[in-house]
Amino acid sequence: MEFRIHLLKIILFLAIAFEFLSIKAFATELNNKIKFEIKASEKLEWYQLDNKIVALGNAEVKSNLFKINADEIEGFYNGQIGKGKIKKLIAKKNAAFKSSQIFINSNYMEYDLEEEILIVTGNNISMTSNLGSINAQKSLVYEKSKKQIFLEGNVLIELKNPNSKIYANRLIISIDEKENITLVKAIDMVNVKLDELQQNIFSDEAEFDNLKRKINFKGNVILNQNDSTLKGNNAIIDFEKGLSSITSTKQSSVTGVFY
């Protein structure tokens, strides 16, 4: 009897060990160019007919370029496991994407590794970067090859320097090779609040150049400061010079420049 119990323990131990080793092996050899490591606190499921791996419970996919965490992550691959490569990742519930300079959170995201496009959807999307924090209520698309990020749906970006807020329906962000934000373009129902200058500006479009430290406003510009209101077609806020200017092509409109 004791011998049977002892034998069962050995078999159980070997089964657990073999399962762990096999999971670790295919989880780290899914891509023959970029190595991935897939972890999960509950279990990893391998659907061979669908070429799919599912990680459940505190799931994590990690490479030398990025990391994705979520309650559940699905990985789709081409070819045979260990010889093929992952082509797509889907993260569900409490999903988080992290690269060198960009952190994105939402309840759902898809990452096309072949096209290098991250698609994030949901009504509570957040992103942080070297520039500040951003929130959106519809979608975020990060096209790495184009070095651009597109956000849509009641977008709010809170800048660290200068201390200000930009509201818009859509936002287009340009980044450099190191993922630092260089340019932010706000489109549709734009409202910019500049705390340091005590200005509140409305326009059709606004473009913040992080390198030149300027914001350019275009179309139906309304600049409010204290009790003063100025209207025009274009405006520029130069943070380096501490200069605000508003101009218009209409002769009847007021043009003002003040420090």
Question: Could you describe each region identified by the protein language model?
Answer:
Residues 25-259:
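N-terminal amphipathic/hydrophobic interface segments
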